[in-house]
Amino acid sequence: MEFITLENEVVKLKPLELSDLPGILETGSYPEIWSHMSTTIEKKEDVNKFVENALKAKNEKTEFPFVIVDKQSGDIIGSTRFMDIDDKHQRLEIGYTWLTPAYWRTAINTNCKYLLLRYSFEHLHLQRVQIKTDHDNIRSQKAIERIGATKEGILRNHMIRKDGTTRHTVMYSITIEEWPQVKKHLERLLV
């Protein structure tokens, strides 16, 4: 996979780099971001680990991490990535998406997903893109459903959270056959 920057007039998704550490630390320092995530960013060491792990996965070509930049302010406001990349079966997952709370319930996530999905289906020619979330993360489920993804089911006892409790995972997907309709839907939301 080529390391690319995706952007429109609202948002820029640029490949994560070591130089993004300060922006991620500032943007990710809100505990509410991490309540349903498998990682937490509270201090510089957490950011270092987050970026190191992401860059390692990028070098291994198993993930492609982006930072999310608000085009109006130029600030880093979150992160997302392509992960579980499977060339043989022409699929990947969009995941590890987080935004600083000031950008929750804005057009940013919709713009990000549109850019990622369009690239996945129209440039990578994938058959399937999946997105999954914690069953307790209702806000995320609503956001995924809002973009037009199909809820496939729940993976029971799928993960152990950082606090030791069991997480069930809600699985969503968009297939190549669904993409034209989802694309039209997203383009209406972006207007």
Describe each PLM feature range:
Residues 130-132, 150-164:
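Conserved catalytic-core motifs of GNAT/GCN5-like acyltransferases
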Residues 131-141:
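Conserved beta-strand-loop-alpha-helix junction that forms the acyl-donor binding cleft
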Residues 1-106, 119, 165-191:
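GNAT-family acyltransferases
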Residues 105-119, 142:
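Conserved acetyl-CoA-binding loop-helix of GNAT-fold acetyltransferases
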Residues 122-132:
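Conserved GNAT acetyl-CoA-binding A-motif
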